[in-house]
From Swiss-Prot:
<dbReference type="GO" id="GO:0005506">
    <property type="term" value="F:iron ion binding"/>
</dbReference>
<keyword id="KW-0813">Transport</keyword>
<keyword id="KW-0812">Transmembrane</keyword>
<dbReference type="GO" id="GO:0031676">
    <property type="term" value="C:plasma membrane-derived thylakoid membrane"/>
</dbReference>
<dbReference type="InterPro" id="IPR036826">
    <property type="entry name" value="Cyt_f_lg_dom_sf"/>
</dbReference>
<keyword id="KW-0602">Photosynthesis</keyword>
<protein>
    <recommendedName>
        <fullName>Cytochrome f</fullName>
    </recommendedName>
</protein>
<comment type="subunit">
    <text>The 4 large subunits of the cytochrome b6-f complex are cytochrome b6, subunit IV (17 kDa polypeptide, PetD), cytochrome f and the Rieske protein, while the 4 small subunits are PetG, PetL, PetM and PetN. The complex functions as a dimer.</text>
</comment>
<keyword id="KW-0732">Signal</keyword>
<dbReference type="InterPro" id="IPR024094">
    <property type="entry name" value="Cyt_f_lg_dom"/>
</dbReference>
<keyword id="KW-1133">Transmembrane helix</keyword>
<dbReference type="GO" id="GO:0009055">
    <property type="term" value="F:electron transfer activity"/>
</dbReference>
<comment type="function">
    <text>Component of the cytochrome b6-f complex, which mediates electron transfer between photosystem II (PSII) and photosystem I (PSI), cyclic electron flow around PSI, and state transitions.</text>
</comment>
<dbReference type="Pfam" id="PF01333">
    <property type="entry name" value="Apocytochr_F_C"/>
</dbReference>
<dbReference type="InterPro" id="IPR024058">
    <property type="entry name" value="Cyt-f_TM"/>
</dbReference>
<dbReference type="GO" id="GO:0015979">
    <property type="term" value="P:photosynthesis"/>
</dbReference>
<keyword id="KW-0479">Metal-binding</keyword>
Length: 327
């Protein structure tokens, strides 16, 4: 399952997202982080997906050792929305999710799942975050229209086989995003972000790349990075007291300024094309001992039997007292 998932995701990235995609794919966290959950509790996907959107999660209250159970992650959003793709065109939103399980918990294999669980996960390719962290699960990119809910099949550990695991209450951390990120893994802006004026001054020129980088003057063409050599890329020139400042705006964001407009440093010169976002939730999960459950059932049964016997004894005493009175 892991190999298929990685191949599938790699193909999507190569075919659809361009040279530096800021996508709804948790796999980008693997490039820079050994652990996708920071010490503060924040899942690192939020570092690139700056807009907050809701995430829903269904986690069992308690599980027993060896039990195969499912965690359901809901990723709601307005299906009528379309996002800006890497080339500036519009398209549907993709989704991705990450589930940080307690250590010892892992992804269930197909052989361990029930038929119902196989059907629920048939079109999702879930992989561990790394060989060293099989308790952290990733999925995506997936078409958002068909995957507003993602099911993760999980196996609970057995403390008898793994001494590092105990019967206790644990926390499960879940994050999900829809749409492309606003930042690339290297921290640069993606074309799914707002671009701002680099200096206070006046916009004096807008040069647009129509088909080839040669469309631009040489002094401006050298400013355009290879990943932005796309039709629709614009180079904005601002005249300020310190000289000319240029800003490269890739295709996608729409300009909200025109030549001759005065701007202040940091003012937005494009709209915000982002329609997606990231959300994170936490849930409790108890690893329950079957022996404790058995003893609890036995204890409750004993209490019930004792109460019944007390009622019967009380009735017996009442009958004896009634007979003595009548006699």
């Amino acid at each position: 399952m892991k190999r298929i998932g990685l191949v599938f995701c790699a193909l999507l990235l190569l075919l659809g997202m361009g040279a530096r995609p800021a996508a709804a794919y948790p796999y980008y966290a693997q490039m820079a982080y050994d652990n996708p959950r920071e010490a503060t509790g924040k899942i690192v996907c939020a570092n690139c997906h700056l807009n907050a959107m809701p995430t829903r999660a269904e986690v069992p209250q308690a599980v027993t050792p060896g039990q195969v159970f499912t965690i359901k992650v809901g990723i709601p959003y307005d299906l009528s929305k379309q996002q800006v793709l890497a080339d500036g065109s519009k398209g549907g939103l993709n989704v991705g999710a990450v589930v940080v399980l307690p250590e010892g918990f892992r992804l269930a294999t197909e052989a361990e799942m029930t038929e119902e669980q196989r059907q629920e996960t048939a079109e999702t390719y879930i992989t561990p975050y790394s060989d060293a962290k099989p308790n952290i699960l990733l999925v995506g990119p997936l078409p958002g229209e068909q995957h507003q809910e993602i099911v993760f099949p999980v196996v609970a550990p057995d403390p008898k086989e793994d001494p590092s695991v105990a019967f206790m209450k644990y926390r499960v951390y879940i994050g999900a995003n829809r749409g492309r990120g606003q930042l690339n893994p290297d921290g640069s802006l993606s074309n799914n972000n707002v671009f701002r004026a680099p200096a206070t001054g006046r916009l004096v020129n807008i040069a647009t790349l129509d088909s080839d980088i040669s469309d631009l003057p040489a002094e401006l063409a050298s400013l355009v990075p290879p990943e932005y050599e796309l039709p629709g890329t614009r180079v904005l020139s601002f005249e300020s007291e310190s000289g000319i400042h240029n800003l490269v705006v890739p295709p996608g964001p729409e300009l909200v300024v025109a030549v001759g407009d005065s701007v202040k440093e940091g003012d937005p010169v494009t709209n915000n094309p982002n329609v997606g976002g990231f959300g994170q939730v936490e849930r409790d999960l108890v690893l329950q001992s079957p022996d404790r459950v058995k003893w609890l059932v036995a204890f409750l049964a004993a209490i019930t039997i004792t109460q019944v016997l007390l009622v019967l004894k009380k009735k017996q005493v009442e009958l004896i007292q009634a007979a003595e009175i009548l006699g």
